Amino acid sequence: MDDEVAALVIDNGSGMCKAGFAGDDAPRAVFPSIVGRPRHQGVMVGMGQKDSYVGDEAQSKRGILTLKYPIEHGIVTNWDDMEKIWHHTFYNELRVAPEEHPVLLTEAPLNPKANREKMTQIMFETFNAPAFYVAIQAVLSLYASGRTTGIVLDSGDGVSHTVPIYEGFALPHAILRLDLAGRDLTGYLVKCLMERGYPFTTTAEREIVRDIKEKLCYVALDFEQEMQTAAQSSQLEKSYELPDGQVITIGNERFRCPEALFQPSFLGLEAAGIHETTYNSIMKCDLDIRKDLYGNVVLSGGTTMYSGIADRMQKEITSLAPSSMKVKIVAPPERKYSVWIGGSILASLSTFQSMWISKQEYDEAGPSIVHRKCF
């Protein structure tokens, strides 16, 4: 596809923003969805201080900034900061003029109508996009796996959803949301490490814990069994070197942390785990399509990257499903970015080119056009 007119694909997650060009097989830019503002005016003398920083720059200067996430639980809650993130995406990360490229954005399942309209309005009025489309994240993940029917468990940093999809359409009545995701697991690991006598208190230190989580945590196939193994020997222990050179040891925390996905009571939440939520979602669907859903359970998002998670899901859902049911868990290696990849695939399809909302259509109908063209 000609780079001049390549569509831009932006997947705005609660934790990370993934952006790039339609037709590429991976996003060109992946950066934290954060906006930072100086805690104290004029601390950094002669640094030419800006009033706000976005993404990696905010992350690296986090010591002197207050960091805010404009996307909470998958939903945009702060539009001024969101605009800053989009501006940064176009001009600093991708280095493109947004008025020259169609823009595909992603949205959380069950995103409020007013939010879709606001996104549409900002893209056309602030950034002058020539064409625009918004697609549901889980649907894109399913496309990326080469399917049009299945149930997607999409778990990122801020929220998890189970989304049953039939022939390319999400079934809204059966979508379930679980407010338990990567950020909560990081917080839980902080608590577990605290009990071990390793205090991590500042936002900067939480980032270290996030790294520990990503590098060392895994999902146990049998939690009780694993706890016994951990108690009896040190074979499950790993060490981690902190930035200051101190080395800490982490044992059963490695699998206790992600176990909260299956047992939210660990976090004090009265919610069903990801396996049960997936099952409940399937049970809200028509009897006739359940077999297709059980046979196509697709994992998506960074919080599904733990080793052992697919086997555990297989075990749990098989025990919930009817005994003769064939259960298949699909865990693509690139699932951290599968929403973005699905967007890249969709936006470069020749059949999709008639689906864009054009600037002209927007000017004639206003923001509500998004409900007619994007579903």
Swiss-Prot record:
- Entry superkingdom: Eukaryota
Annotated catalysed reactions: ATP + H2O = ADP + phosphate + H(+)
Q: Which GO terms describe its cellular component?
A: cytoplasm; cytoskeleton
- Localisation per UniProt entry: Cytoplasm, Cytoskeleton
Q: Which residues lie in coiled coils? A: none
SMART domains attached to this UniProt entry: ACTIN
**Record PROSITE patterns:** ACTINS_1, ACTINS_2, ACTINS_ACT_LIKE
To which protein family does this belong?
Belongs to the actin family.
Q: What is this protein called?
A: Actin
High-level lineage: Eukaryota, Fungi, Dikarya, Basidiomycota, Agaricomycotina
